[in-house]
């Protein structure tokens, strides 16, 4: 099924597919992504031919939702406030949890926020491609390649975005793993000053 992003019931329909444990393709705040609930990860890994050891990014509706999933005792209040102040933006943050790590992003996109609100929980997001290949941004190519395997593709036109910046704050020293379309100034943490937002 193909839906246009601007269609009136697009969010409700997309949400219903996700809640049925389907993997869908949606336009995100950066590029097109495979998305779904955590319980649909096995399906996603099969479609994408991705190694299950590679963790997925999860999208959240509001910055403060991250506090439910991370080890807040690992961070100072300033550090927590600093990271949350940079959302919503195309910034993926790998946090420490009680037992391992989790990668979260709070997207700066009204449509995505509406979808996350409708679903009522975080959803995974990973680039549309076969693992090891370049991410796909041309919607015609995406439809041609995945329409048989994916029950719902949301058409938001061609996206010429840049992948999100990824930072790892699950251990010290904190570091940038991937430079994307967003810049974060880590010096603010070491200097103990108020964060600069870009």
Positions of predicted regions on the chain:
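Active-site-adjacent structural elements in enzyme catalytic cores
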Residues: 1-198
């Amino acid at each position: 099924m193909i839906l246009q992003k601007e269609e009136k019931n697009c969010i409700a329909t997309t949400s219903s597919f996700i809640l049925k444990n389907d993997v869908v393709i949606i336009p995100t705040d950066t590029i097109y992504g495979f998305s779904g609930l955590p319980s649909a990860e096995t399906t996603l890994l099969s479609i994408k031919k991705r190694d299950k050891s590679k963790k997925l990014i999860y999208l959240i509706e509001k910055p403060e939702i991250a506090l439910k999933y991370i080890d807040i005792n690992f961070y100072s209040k300033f550090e927590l406030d600093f990271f949350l102040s940079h959302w919503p933006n195309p910034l993926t943050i790998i946090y420490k949890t009680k037992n391992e790590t989790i990668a979260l992003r709070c997207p700066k996109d009204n449509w995505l926020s509406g979808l996350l609100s409708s679903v009522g929980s975080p959803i995974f997001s990973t680039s549309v491609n076969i693992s090891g290949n370049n991410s796909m941004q041309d919607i015609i190519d995406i439809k041609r390649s995945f329409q048989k395997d994916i029950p719902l593709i949301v058409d938001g036109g061609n996206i010429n975005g840049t992948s999100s910046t990824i930072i790892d704050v699950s251990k010290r020293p904190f570091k940038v793993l991937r430079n994307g379309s967003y810049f974060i100034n880590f010096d603010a943490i070491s200097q103990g000053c108020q964060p600069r937002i870009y």
